[in-house]
Amino acid sequence: MNDWSIDAARAGYNVTHWSQGFYGISDQGEVTVSPDPKNPDHKIGLNELAKDMVKAGVALPVLVRFPQILHHRVNSLCQAFDQAIQKYEYQADYLLVYPIKVNQQKTVVEEILASQASKEVPQLGLEAGSKPELMAVLAMAQKASSVIVCNGYKDNEYIRLALIGEKLGHKVYIVLEKLSELKMVLAESKRLGVKPRLGLRARLAFQGKGKWQASGGEKSKFGLSAAQILTVVDQLKENDMLDSLQLLHFHLGSQIANIRDIRQGVSEAARFYCELRELGASINCFDVGGGLAVDYDGTRSQSNNSMNYGLSEYANNIVNVLTDICNEYEQPMPRIISESGRHLTAHHAVLITDVIGTEAYQVEDIQPPAEESPQLLHNMWQSWTELSGRADQRALIEIYHDSQSDLQEAQSLFALGQLSLAERAWAEQANLRVCHEVQGLLSTKNRYHRPIIDELNEKLADKFFVNFSLFQSLPDAWGIDQVFPVLPLSGLDKAPERRAVMLDITCDSDGIVDQYVDGQGIETTLPVPAWSAESPYLMGFFMVGAYQEILGDMHNLFGDTNSAVVSIEENGMTNIESVLAGDTVADVLRYVNLDAVDFMRTYEELVNQHIVEEERAQILEELQVGLKGYTYLEDFS
């Protein structure tokens, strides 16, 4: 590509749109991060950052966190709602509640809470969906507004802990997910002498579209029907505790791509709110739950990996709908709460790792088949000669399909013993020559060619063996076909010469990234610069800050990666604030109840039995180092 430029690279990887300005490509072809939007000229080259960490003894793969991105995401969302409240003259405020299930890492939660440390009245609270999460937020919520929202299924202990939170000075909303929870709350609150703050999760009829749409609608796992909500109101009236009902909650599902779905869901929920107010409930908080999407592919569309709205439009629609419906019912406007964890955390983390090797198809010259060869091979040779000397553009697709059909027949004949191994190898190489030639002759401007182009890009793609576990670091890519931006961290000033797929180092054929951001769409292969072992480049997996760490599993006993917290100082200097070591081999063995100490005893017995005395110390040291070592590959040069 003679017309390749840095702008072409930026457009090709669509960095401008999915990165929200946090990541970019420099004029030198290096991927950069600008974690502090107040100082956009303060950039860090990710390639150099990774090399510096490796020199300091931090082995790849490493998950790099940028806390300044978390700060910006918190404050930009709060600002969007503040502006919408002012625009529509809304008579209440906004509170951002972070659901820690999205990323429970101490650094992440603390940085989110610290993002508004300078505010006189912080607009932050925390959400818990289990007893362990509740124990965590009880110890951390005082750093913000002390508002805690308790979701999820509950037992008596969960409820007691939530009520104890009130005694500790927190404002704890216990959201009823099912009818039986009310009886437990009433009993435990009486026993502890604590008046509860109650919330209801309404089960809306409306269901948003997306991968998590089952979270909403009449068949959703959580929430109360209209009849059950009325039962709660009646029981609270009987116990003279209707004033304890202070919050209405609903959830349309994570990653709602279409703003119309959000508007419609809020509209239905707002009528629940107003009807409950008319029944005498003292509800003053309207919790819209999650759903605020992240544009993983940068297409700004209604796809499952994107969103067709921005922050201002999101806030404006919620505030506008609530304003209109509250005015219609002549009811007071409630405090708006959202639980937007994915939006806050996705961009702040990037996984950086190395390519340990590549495998490319080798297209070789072929000679005509021997005269006595099966007719099938002569047919394949004829297809190749017609293609290499052809003048008829319309024959391209026909020749390609004939070659594919002939290859399948050759493989079948080999399985029946009617074709030799050498003849099968010739057939495969002839097909590869045809595919390679056709790939260079097809045009993306011809819509009949596009499916074949996609097919050939996938068939002829290089394999990049990358030092990571898909199941540990990008589990959603495997489990729900989530798209994450992937790109080389350097060399992007040169035109991509190859297309590649990224394979992890697990012993599992599912350990492959099979979707890539490519321009304004998704492809099954990634355009990459030429790669060589003498001058390798690193790979970056972006927007992995939401859910991936806590959902990651230890397939093949690959554990947590090393991680680092990095920021930019006011003077533009890079500050590696902290480094957390990933799991060692001994750590992951312990997770599955295997004891490294016992193993060492066994190793010693085996060494004494089978190794000559002068080698025993060295062998035992190697085994001990192996147990203490990183679970990922370190020595493959």
UniProtKB/Swiss-Prot annotation:
Q: Name one Pfam family in it.
A: Orn_Arg_deC_N
Question: Which cofactors must be present for this protein to function?
Answer: Mg(2+); pyridoxal 5'-phosphate
Question: Any idea which UniProt keywords this protein has?
Answer: Decarboxylase, Lyase, Magnesium, Metal-binding, Polyamine biosynthesis, Pyridoxal phosphate, Spermidine biosynthesis
Q: What is its EC number?
A: 4.1.1.19
Q: Which family does it belong to?
A: Belongs to the Orn/Lys/Arg decarboxylase class-II family. SpeA subfamily.
Q: What is this protein called?
A: Biosynthetic arginine decarboxylase
Modified residue annotations for N6-(pyridoxal phosphate)lysine: 101
InterPro entries linked:
Ala_racemase/Decarboxylase_C, Arg_decarb_HB, Arg_decarbox_C, Arg_decrbxlase, De-COase2_N, Orn/DAP/Arg_de-COase, PLP-binding_barrel
The job of this chain, per UniProt, is described as:
Catalyzes the biosynthesis of agmatine from arginine.
Extract one GO molecular function annotation from the record: arginine decarboxylase activity
Q: What class of enzyme is it?
A: lyase
GO biological-process terms attached to the record: arginine catabolic process; putrescine biosynthetic process from arginine; spermidine biosynthetic process
Q: Which NCBIfam families match?
A: PRK05354.1, speA
CDD domains named among the record's database cross-references: PLPDE_III_ADC
> Which pathway, metabolic or otherwise, does it act in?
Amine and polyamine biosynthesis; agmatine biosynthesis; agmatine from L-arginine: step 1/1
Question: Which residues bind substrate per the record?
Answer: 286-296
Q: Which reaction does it catalyse?
A: L-arginine + H(+) = agmatine + CO2
Is Lyase found in the keyword set? yes
Which HAMAP family does this UniProt record tie to the protein? SpeA
Q: Does the keyword Metal-binding apply?
A: yes
What intrachain disulfides are recorded?
Answer: none
User: Which Gene3D superfamilies is this protein grouped with?
Assistant: 1.10.287.3440, 1.20.58.930, Alanine racemase, Lyase, Ornithine Decarboxylase, Chain A, domain 1
Source domain of life is Bacteria
